[in-house]
Amino acid sequence: MATRIASFIGISTVASLALANGINVPDTISRDVIILGAGSSGTYAAIRLKDEGKTVAVVERNDYLGGHGETYYTEDNTPLNFGVEGFFNTSVTRNYLERLQVPYGRRNPAPAHEDYVNLNTGQRTEYPPGQLQDREAFAKWVDAISQFGFLDDGVYRITEPVPEDLIIPFADFVKKYHLEDAVYALFSHTSGDVLEMITLYVIQYIGIPHAAALNEGYVRPIEGIAALYKSAGKELGSDVLLKTTPESVQRSKDGVEVTVRSADGTKTLLKGKQLLVTIPPLLENLHGFPLSDQESRIFSKWQYHQYWAALVNDTGLPDDVNIVNVDTERLYGVPEEPFIWRLDNHWAPGYHNIKLVGGSDFGEDEAKAYMYEKLDLLHEEGTYSTHKPEIVKFASHTPVTMFVSAEEIRGGFYRQLYELQGLNSTFWTGATWASDYSTLLWGYTDEVLDQMASS
């Protein structure tokens, strides 16, 4: 009771006492919804909420919106996307782009032929013998996973009891459903050691909607992925607090208070009726959150991979070549972590995207050293005249493939995860809660916004 009584002391009295003692009183902003994170999900939610007449405050640690959706512009203003390179061509995507008046078109990769190289030896090889190309492989795969229709929208809406085939290692699923000749094509759309992954997570990388999108083609903003987020930034204006991080979060059924600190040290108190968290719910990301026992227990279970997206210039690689990694010593040609997945040619001469994947200890320094090592190896073997490149951008997409054990899934982990929605005026969305593809994340975010509206 004493705490509740104290909370009603006049604000002016508290401010006067604070000023008299040299304490800075943070400015206060009141909004309907406070959003943590302005990546793909957070930005989409902010625009949708504003369209519904809600007021928002969006807290973002970076100096830009869009998270992994970054674009580098060359001197002649050619947009080079790295990380997110396109969106599924669905009504959700088209409506969003048109809402923000962002011109878009079909995503076409830069013209190039693919060279298959074993990056453990630095030597050229071939597409893994006996492995199907994408279209044929996906047809077999879709037939095998069509039994899990509850995953078709990318959300972890898993039936209980959990089907055992969903939580066996992918290598076992492959043998059971005679998919041995489809593995390499499927690997190229996942992130991690695919043979050891639980089948559920492979489906969340390349499931029914993903295969359909690959067949139908992607779309992308003509002026680069960043154009979408620049337009959203103009719409949101001062409702976005860039280069700002939450310091403390207080939540109850009556509303939320979030104290944030900007890059210059200024503190601001954000008061809202609801909180929408779009950042990955790892315990290390939730400092300042007094989590419930249920939240702490669930969020402590996560494991994940590290994923780095490098945009490099002047590698010595030809401009008309994509390098695809094939490990000729491993089953189905699938590399083991850490590995470079691909080196892709770009739309401007000299530029390539490099995608690197590793375990939880594959940090930025390790990833850069690994990249240099493999480029050196290509030179030493005489495969290409490669040399140390200029790193234009080196972006972290960590954590990627956030996962839990088969035992946790069998025990109802995802049901318990979704039961957190709405507790203490707090809602959650983002890549942990649905397949990590923007179009699917936007679809799930729409569901969450409906829950918020009805709570």
From Swiss-Prot:
Keyword presence, Signal: yes
Pfam families: Amino_oxidase
Keywords: FAD, Flavoprotein, Oxidoreductase, Signal, Virulence
Reaction(s) catalysed (UniProt annotation): beta-cyclopiazonate + A = alpha-cyclopiazonate + AH2
The keyword Flavoprotein is assigned to this record: yes
Molecular function GO labels: beta-cyclopiazonate dehydrogenase activity
InterPro entries (alphabetical): Amino_oxidase, FAD/NAD-bd_sf
Cofactor (UniProt): FAD
Enzyme class: oxidoreductase
Signal peptide: 1-20
Entry's EC annotation: 1.21.99.1
Its biological purpose: Beta-cyclopiazonate dehydrogenase involved in the synthesis of the fungal neurotoxin alpha-cyclopiazonic acid (CPA). CpaO carries out the dehydrogenation of beta-CPA to yield an unstable enimine product, which is captured by intramolecular cyclization to create the pentacyclic fused scaffold of alpha-cyclopiazonate.
UniProt family annotation: Belongs to the beta-cyclopiazonate dehydrogenase family.
Protein name per Swiss-Prot or TrEMBL: Beta-cyclopiazonate dehydrogenase
Gene: cpaO
